[in-house]
Amino acid sequence: MIERGKFRSLTLINWNGFFARTFDLDELVTTLSGGNGAGKSTTMAAFVTALIPDLTLLHFRNTTEAGATSGSRDKGLHGKLKAGVCYSMLDVLNSRHQRVVVGVRLQQVAGRDRKVDIKPFAIQGLPMSVQPTQLVTETLNERQARVLTLAELKEKLDAMEGVQFKQFNSITDYHSLMFDLGIIARRLRSASDRSKFYRLIEASLYGGISSAITRSLRDYLLPENSGVRKAFQDMEAALRENRMTLEAIRVTQSDRDLFKHLISEATNYVAADYMRHANERRVHLDKALEFRRELYTSRKQLAAEQYKHVDMARELGEHNGAEGDLEADYQAASDHLNLVQTALRQQEKIERYEADLDELQIRLEEQNEVVAEAADMQEENEARAEAAELEVDELKSQLADYQQALDVQQTRAIQYNQAIQALDRAKALCHLPDLTADSAAEWLETFQAKEQEATEKLLSLEQKMSVAQTAHSQFEQAYQLVAAINGPLARNEAWSVARDLLREGVEQRHLAEQVQPLRMRLSELEQRLREQQEAERLLAEFCKRQGKHFDIDELEALHQELEARIAALSDSVSNAHEQRMTLRQEQEQLQSRIQHLMQRAPIWLAAQNSLNQLCEQSGEEFTSSQDVTEYLQQLLEREREAIVERDEVGARKNAVDEEIERLSQPGGSEDSRLNALAERFGGVLLSEIYDDVSFEDAPYFSALYGPSRHAIVVPDLSLIAEQLEGLTDCPEDLYFIEGDPQSFDDSVFSVDELENAVVVKTAERQWRYSRFPTVPIFGRAARENRIESLHAEREGLSERFATLSFDVQKTQRLHQAFSRFIGSHLAVAFEADPEAEIRQLNGRRVELERALATHENDNQQQRIQFEQAKEGVSALNRLLPRLNLLADDTLADRVDEIQERLDDAQEAARFIQQHGNQLAKLEPIVSVLQNDPEQFEQLKEDYAYSQQTQRDARQQAFALTEVVQRRAHFSYSDSAEMLSGNSDLNEKLRQRLEQAEAERTRAREALRGHAAQLSQYNQVLASLKSSYDTKKELLGDLQRELQDIGVRADSGSEERARIRRDELHTQLSNNRSRRNQLEKALTFCEAEMDNLTRRLRKLERDYHEMREQVVTAKAGWCAVMRMVKDNGVERRLHRRELAYLSADELRSMSDKALGALRLAVADNEHLRDVLRMSEDPKRPERKIQFFVAVYQHLRERIRQDIIRTDDPVEAIEQMEIELSRLTEELTSREQKLAISSRSVANIIRKTIQREQNRIRMLNQGLQNVSFGQVNSVRLNVNVRETHATLLDVLSEQHEQHQDLFNSNRLTFSEALAKLYQRLNPQIDMGQRTPQTIGEELLDYRNYLEMEVEVNRGSDGWLRAESGALSTGEAIGTGMSILVMVVQSWEDEGRRLRGKDISPCRLLFLDEAARLDARSIATLFELCERLQMQLIIAAPENISPEKGTTYKLVRKVFHNTEHVHVVGLRGFAPQLSETLPGTGTEDASSQAAG
């Protein structure tokens, strides 16, 4: 007999009035007695709080608040506590004699909401000697103690050996421990379970009939038929899973590429990146090596460029220095040429001016003669005009006088006067005072003779004058010529100087004639000298370029040597070209072959992958195509054998399934028709009656009843006789046994038990011998055992069938794979490895590249040598023709000598050019210099005197002529004579006047004309003199300028200066061109050096970066490789055919796969997050993690009972193999799993019958319970009418509603709900789904209606309601119902908990004074009979005779409240005994904490 667990004590720490109080609880009834406010309700509240520490439920209201849904804000708990740490602990001893202390730590939370903080805990393994108050308090002195905090309590308990302390964060865990240890009767899994438990405690505490409990008695009293419900749920779950699997298979069949897509895209995504990183790593290594090679090459190039830069800079410096000298020389040559040209122009001007001066001098001399002649003529014309004028005047005067005399009779007197005047003038002119008119004629002849003499003398002097003047002009001309040539000199030195000048002129003219030959000779020599200098320069440059000094004699030999070297290098270059062509051709052939192999490699690799897969799948090694075809024939034979074995295993599995189905019939009937027949005849199957027989007794009873073990037990056989008529739907043998199904026994037979057999005497003359069956199936235990063994066999058969089916499918797919391989890859699979040949060819290609590089280097060096040799030969070709010049050492001296001679000749030429004309003029007149014509001036004076004398004589003769002509006038004596004589004279005078006037007019015109001509001649002469003087002055200036220029100007000097300037210009241009070339080359070299420096820095940076990248990538790659190898995915990721794709192609492939994967994993949060993380290009290992996550995800989705592999790829392949087989198998399984509606109705009916029987048993326990007028209490259980109709339809008329139960779209629960709605259309189902309604209809509790009835006085059985009962009757009735609930919970919990634990039973009752003594005695009797503990609270007038009573008195001591407690155990027949732990708490008011 298992002892029931008991609550030993209740401990309150720091509650209002209780500092540290422990209440020992009685095994039956503990009574708390005391007045109002003594602390009874506080004590019970502490107990309830320790049992249910749920603040959402706890509500300690006063009795006056009964029925209220909301009381004070703190719900009564805050005010029952003191400040600080508080405890409520229960000390329990369970059925296993384990001491457990459970409780809660409470603490008020500051604030207006008056909240309380609760922490549940449990203590196990506590020694019996340790009191609860000792655990949570610490004694400070004799009158003071302190409450420990929960942490201090834990530390204290941890120090105690064997004591376990547990603190709970959830109430569920707390109640789970209490249920497992037998402290509470029911497992409180949820808040609703805790609510039910609290409502039970609350109903017990406050007494009466709780409407909350009576309205839901089914939930409290009727246990959940978890087995049946679980069976239905498992069946539906299996069906649902089956249908979901079928749907998944259909989805998989319709979207067969789902997994393939995910794994293929994941493989493409990761493998492409994996291979790209592998390729990049190889490329980076190659780049690093290439960078290093380029770095070394660039360093060499930079050093070579630096050497080249130094040479060119040195050469440029030389050219810059030479350019300055050449520029100076060129500028000097240009200036010299300009000076020569200027001198030539000056010389031309001088010559032109000299010619002009000579011409002007001639013209001047001629003009002087013309002017002199014109002057003489002018003088004559003037004298003639003057004479004519005088004659005209005289004639006019005479004529006037004659006219006047004629006019006034005085003409004779006038003429006489005029004659006298003429005589007087003649006397004056002739100095003849004695002159008379008569002697005038004589004197006229004298004076005419004198005039003739003067004229002749004048002519003689004029001739002499002309001769003297000519001699004087020649002397002056010669003297001026000598002075112009020699400079100022004395006149007496002119003759000797002129002779010297003429001799020197002859010499100078001889020298001047040699200028042109000397100039030509000098030009030739200078050209040779320049060629010699050019040759020396070329030789110096040649030696400089050759880096060695060569003598002139060595140049011809060197030329031959260089010619031979050029020929050899030319042959070498041509041979090198052919060799290079051969190497390049071989390289191109290798490259073409490598390209071809690289194109063929992916095909070969695909064939190898397919071949490797075939080898892995078949476990064979194939070395030729013949092996493949032979193995394909073996596969066909193996497939036929596997199909035969699979069909045999399938037949046996079907037989086992049929047997399992037969044994799984409700009630143990092997024929489903027996259940319907049993219901029809109102009986019970014998197998159902013996359903509880043990497995050990099953063989006996199976043998006992033999064939009748499937009989139907009916109360009366006579009642079924009529029903047997026309019975066709039944087994061949149908047995009936008469008996009471409730009290059936096996006494209907006479039986003798033998060893493993029985002899049944069915009649006096009929015995039956039955051996115990080897595999009994009579009774639920035997059937379950047999079903279990059949299930085990079925599992084996199913596994074998699945294995064989998988093998068949695998063989078929392997056959298909071989067929595909033969069709696609057989032609190339067994060819040589192209990658090995590629590696070999790459090695050869590297050798060729190295040979080409070496060859190019050698060829470059040969080309340089060839170019150097060509340059040397070219320089020698220019040098060799000038070897004689190089050997001529006297050339410069000869040039100097000729230059001196040329200078002398040019000086002479300049002298002749300057004075040649003067010497030529001087030579014919040089003799006039012997005598100096000094008398020329005296002659000029004589000539002037003679001229004046001749003029005076002419005037005197003219005056005498006039006197002679007027001699007649002296004889006028009278006027007649005068008139007659004057008339002729007048006529003559008039005639002479006309003649004289005509002569005067001619003389005047001649004079004017001659005067104008003389003026013109004088103007011409003045102009000629002015021009002569100007040109002479300009000539002097030009000669001075020519002397100032200091350049000898001749016909060849300009050409030589120009040639020299052009040569220097050519040299300067060549120098500048070379300098520009050098500058450009230097700039290019510097740029190349800068480029090389930058490139070198870039290469160094790139090399270091690439090296760091390689090192970093190596670490990352090692991590990736480690992860790949650890997860075994290298075979999937290292796809060698991807190595032949470019990085862009691989990146594109990865990006495309990434886009597809984003869509594929959009609904999977984990894979989506991992995929998002894997997109980081700097973390390639995350892509491996994603691939592993995909594999893991697919592995988790692989059903190991279907597909036996961890590899998702193989799983996908196996999945395709299993799809068709699973579809067929699951379809048949669904048909087997589907339970019939009749079976459901039978199960629900049997469950209802069983629970009705159990309620009847509970009612028997309450028959003797009475409270006041209530004599008995019972529970009435009835089936609802609507649900009874549903059961009838399910049993009898289910064929009419097969459209619901045969629908694949509806679960059984939904079909059941649809049927219920179809049968009861008037019922409103609300918002509930058919699935929810169907699940409720599968719960038998929803078919029942329960109500509490009491047998009260004369009213008989009435429905128990608070309004119809008194307070005491209601309390007693309610307590009875609660006892039934607790007992029902224990029965339910017994199936969930160990059977060796009997839980504690405890109820409360507050304000028990409302019960009378008989009712209280009934409670005590009920507690004793049911082994239940009861805590009641009553005023002091309640004094029960049994149990333990605590009297509580609240006192005030020093302004502090405390409760004085005295405990008594019994008191009527026994002596009073003070319980331990009671007495006044003297120190409670002074306690700290």
UniProtKB/Swiss-Prot annotation:
It comes from the Bacteria. Transmembrane segments: none annotated. The keyword Transcription does not apply. Residues 326-418, 444-472, 509-602, 780-805, 835-919, 977-1116, 1209-1266 form a coiled coil. Its main location: cytoplasm. Signal peptide: none annotated. One of its GO terms (biological process) is cell division. Residues 666-783 are annotated as: Flexible hinge. InterPro entries: MukB (IPR012090), MukB/SMC (IPR050308), MukB_hinge (IPR032520), MukB_hinge_sf (IPR042501), MukB_N_dom (IPR007406), P-loop_NTPase (IPR027417). It holds the Pfam family SbcC_Walker_B. One of its GO terms (cellular component) is nucleoid. GO terms for molecular function: ATP binding; DNA binding. Keywords: ATP-binding, Cell cycle, Cell division, Chromosome partition, Coiled coil, Cytoplasm, DNA condensation, DNA-binding, Nucleotide-binding. ATP binds at G34, G35, N36, G37, A38, G39, K40, S41. It is found in: Cytoplasm, Nucleoid. Belongs to the SMC family. MukB subfamily. Homodimerization via its hinge domain. Binds to DNA via its C-terminal region. Interacts, and probably forms a ternary complex, with MukE and MukF via its C-terminal region. The complex formation is stimulated by calcium or magnesium. Interacts with tubulin-related protein FtsZ. The hinge domain, which separates the large intramolecular coiled coil regions, allows the homodimerization, forming a V-shaped homodimer. Plays a central role in chromosome condensation, segregation and cell cycle progression. Functions as a homodimer, which is essential for chromosome partition. Involved in negative DNA supercoiling in vivo, and by this means organize and compact chromosomes. May achieve or facilitate chromosome segregation by condensation DNA from both sides of a centrally located replisome during cell division. This is Chromosome partition protein MukB. It comes from Citrobacter koseri (strain ATCC BAA-895 / CDC 4225-83 / SGSC4696).
